Amino acid sequence: MATYYSNDFRAGLKIMLDGEPYAVEASEFVKPGKGQAFARVKLRRLLTGTRVEKTFKSTDSAEGADVVDMNLTYLYNDGEFWHFMNNETFEQLSADAKAIGDNAKWLLDQAECIVTLWNGQPIAVTPPNFVELEIIETDPGLKGDTAGTGGKPATLSTGAVVKVPLFVQIGEVIKVDTRSGEYVSRVK
């Protein structure tokens, strides 16, 4: 893999630090009037998703990480692993609960997901930005009940719980933003 110096760090670059892959989220190159130039870099640890801020001297370097994002189709969950398929090669990959994280509640059969691979192993799964799910349980909305503006909780077909407006009923299909977990709209 390529070697990157700290002044080459840009948002989106994936590098290796301490034997683990990191993604550069922001980089600021600082050249003080006195002393050596340095880069203040915000990184995201790809294995856990935690954010770290580090300072690199201008002479510091890091190895590029062998990290690949692939568009794969979600097939099914067998209880232990979530299975995905590459639509071009029909090759199947299995991701464990650690790679899926909280995103399991947004996965629908045949949904296009972005699977992040490191050394050929899935380390993160990103569902589509928006999913359409059916409401299977929610309190009935009472006519004229507009005192509270907060809405009500609704359980969706995948088990996710989302706050929805009072007018939404059981059996309706709604659009949800998977990044924030918020209700977007009803689907006609």
From Swiss-Prot:
GO terms for biological process: peptide biosynthetic process. The modification N6-(3,6-diaminohexanoyl)-5-hydroxylysine is found at K34. CDD domains: S1_EF-P_repeat_1 (cd04470), S1_EF-P_repeat_2 (cd05794). It comes from the Bacteria. It is found in: Cytoplasm. Pfam families: EFP, EFP_N, Elong-fact-P_C. One of its GO terms (cellular component) is cytosol. Pathway: Protein biosynthesis; polypeptide chain elongation. May be beta-lysylated on the epsilon-amino group of Lys-34 by the combined action of EpmA and EpmB, and then hydroxylated on the C5 position of the same residue by EpmC (if this protein is present). Lysylation is critical for the stimulatory effect of EF-P on peptide-bond formation. The lysylation moiety may extend toward the peptidyltransferase center and stabilize the terminal 3-CCA end of the tRNA. Hydroxylation of the C5 position on Lys-34 may allow additional potential stabilizing hydrogen-bond interactions with the P-tRNA. One of its GO terms (molecular function) is translation elongation factor activity. Keywords: Cytoplasm, Elongation factor, Hydroxylation, Protein biosynthesis. Belongs to the elongation factor P family. Involved in peptide bond synthesis. Alleviates ribosome stalling that occurs when 3 or more consecutive Pro residues or the sequence PPG is present in a protein, possibly by augmenting the peptidyl transferase activity of the ribosome. Modification of Lys-34 is required for alleviation. This is Elongation factor P. The lineage of its organism: Bacteria, Pseudomonadati, Pseudomonadota, Gammaproteobacteria, Enterobacterales. The gene is efp.
